[in-house]
C-alpha cells in the first residue's frame, strides 16, 4: 500500500480503511453480504436471493469474500456446503446504515427515489477514488491546505502536480471545497460529515469495538452520544438529525434484504442538499 508523509500510525490507519473499503466496494459484494444475513445458506439458496447475477458470476464473488475473511464456506458433507458471515463479516454490517445516513443527508437528490443499497453503493464509489482516504485524512487534520502541501503529505514520493487529478475529483464529488485555482483546499460539509463512517471503518479494521469510532483521533467526536435506535433498511426516513451509534457487543441489525433491494428511502428536502454537493 502507498505510504504517505503522515505519522506512521495514521498512515497505517488509512491503509487499513482503504483495504476495508476495497473488500466491500466491488460490484454486488454488499448485496451478497446482505443476502447472507441470517442462517448460513446453500449455494443454490444464495443464488436465488441474488438472481440478477449471471451464471458463473456468483462463485468468484463468494471466493473473494471468503479470501477477505468476510464469508466462510462450511463443508458439512461432500453434498452439503453452506455459506455465511464470519464474525468479522457480521461485525462490518453496522457501518452500512451509517453510510445510508450520510448519503441521505449529503448526496445530491436523484431523479428517482433510491433504495438504501444504491445509496450505499454510490457512497462507496466516492470513498474508493484513488488517494481519496489519504486526502480526506490530511484535510481533516490540517483544515486548509495548498495543493503543493497536500502533495508533500499524501504522495511525497511522486511529482507534486500528480495531486491535482484526485483533488479535482474530490471537489467534483463535493467532498472538498476550494475557492479556485491556487487557493487552499478544505473539507466540505459532506467531507467532514464522513467522520462516523470513516471512524467506524477504522475501528473495525483495527479489530476494535465499533464504539471506539467516537474516540478516533481524527474523525471522533467523544462528546457525541446519540440515543440508540434500530435501523430498518426499508424504513422511509426524513433528513436525519443524528447518526446511529456504532455497535459494540449487541446483535447485528436485522436486514430485510428484499426490502433493502427494492424499496426506496425518502428523498431529502432540497434545502438539505448543499450546492455542489456530492454527485452520484
Task: Give residue ranges: language-model regions.
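N-terminal helix-turn-helix DNA-binding core of bacterial DNA-binding proteins
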Residues: 14-57, 119-159
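Short amphipathic alpha-helical interaction segments
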Residues: 52-67, 156-172
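Amphipathic alpha-helical dimerization/coiled-coil segments
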Residues: 2, 96-138, 192-280
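Clustered cysteine/histidine zinc-coordinating segments, centered on FYVE zinc fingers that bind PI3P
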Residues: 150-152, 165-168, 217, 231-235
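Structured N-terminal alpha/beta-domain signature
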Residues: 123, 132-139, 147, 163-166, ...
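Recognition helices and adjacent regulatory flanks at domain boundaries
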Residues: 1-15, 43, 49, 62, ...
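Basic, amphipathic "hinge/linker" alpha-helix immediately C-terminal to the N-terminal HTH DNA-binding motif
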Residues: 77-99, 183-198
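A short, conserved structural fragment
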Residues: 66-76, 171-181
Amino acid at each position: 500500500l502507498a505510504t504517505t508523509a503522515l505519522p506512521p500510525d495514521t498512515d497505517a490507519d488509512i491503509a487499513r480503511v482503504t483495504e476495508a473499503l476495497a473488500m466491500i466496494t466491488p460490484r454486488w459484494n454488499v448485496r451478497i453480504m446482505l443476502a447472507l444475513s441470517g442462517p448460513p445458506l446453500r449455494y443454490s439458496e444464495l443464488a436465488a436471493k441474488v438472481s440478477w447475477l449471471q451464471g458463473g458470476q456468483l462463485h468468484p464473488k463468494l471466493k473473494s469474500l471468503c479470501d477477505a475473511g468476510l464469508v466462510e464456506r462450511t463443508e458439512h458433507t461432500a453434498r452439503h456446503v453452506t455459506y455465511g458471515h464470519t464474525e468479522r463479516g457480521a461485525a462490518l454490517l453496522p457501518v452500512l446504515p451509517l453510510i445510508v445516513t450520510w448519503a441521505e443527508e449529503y448526496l445530491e437528490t436523484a431523479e428517482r427515489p433510491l433504495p438504501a443499497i444504491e445509496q450505499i453503493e454510490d457512497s462507496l464509489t466516492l470513498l474508493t477514488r484513488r488517494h481519496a482516504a489519504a486526502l480526506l485524512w490530511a484535510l481533516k487534520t490540517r483544515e486548509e491546505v495548498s495543493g503543493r502541501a497536500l502533495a508533500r503529505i499524501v504522495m511525497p514520493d511522486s511529482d507534486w502536480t500528480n495531486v491535482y487529478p484526485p483533488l479535482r475529483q474530490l471537489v467534483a464529488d463535493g467532498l472538498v471545497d476550494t475557492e479556485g485555482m491556487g487557493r487552499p483546499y478544505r473539507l466540505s460539509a459532506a467531507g467532514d460529515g464522513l467522520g462516523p463512517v470513516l471512524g467506524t471503518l477504522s475501528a473495525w479494521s483495527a479489530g476494535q469495538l465499533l464504539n471506539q469510532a467516537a474516540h478516533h483521533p481524527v474523525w471522533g467526536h467523544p462528546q457525541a452520544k446519540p440515543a440508540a435506535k434500530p435501523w430498518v433498511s426499508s424504513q422511509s426516513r426524513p433528513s436525519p438529525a443524528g447518526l446511529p451509534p456504532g455497535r459494540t457487543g449487541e446483535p447485528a441489525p436485522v436486514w430485510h434484504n428484499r426490502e433493502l433491494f427494492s424499496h426506496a428511502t425518502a428523498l431529502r428536502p432540497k434545502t438539505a442538499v448543499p450546492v455542489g454537493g456530492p454527485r452520484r
